[in-house]
Amino acid sequence: MRKVLVVEDNKSERELITLYLENNNYQVISADNAADGMELAAQQKPDVIITDITMEGINGFEFCRLLKVYPDTEQIPIIACTARDRELDRMWGQKQGIDIYITKPYSERDLVEAIESIVK
């Protein structure tokens, strides 16, 4: 069973993503902020990380950049799920280590296909 770390500060969004993933037989661990997400990523070694961009404290871009700095987390693929859909945001996200950028709203299928495309 593949393990996915969900980092999302909005509880209802986090619960929706968790539901989508559990419906598709993924093991889900979650954090409501980037600092806790960093700790869980290093400890749990998920197969993929799904994160929001707009979060209080450390935002999603900075979170992704930090993940790519540390040897324990640098190889973990990252999917960003966000309402920020400007091309500039996508380009900046790619520079910070985001592998796939999904804009809200998205479907369960969109999310699962994104995971399957980067986790082998």
What does each model-identified segment do?
Residues 106-116:
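C-terminal output helix
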Residues 25-32, 40:
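Short hydrophobic/Thr-rich beta-strand motif most characteristic of the beta2 strand and flanking loop
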Residues 44-50:
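Active-site beta3 strand of CheY-like receiver
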Residues 8:
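Conserved acidic carboxylate
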Residues 14, 56-57, 65, 74, ...:
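The feature encodes the CheY-like receiver
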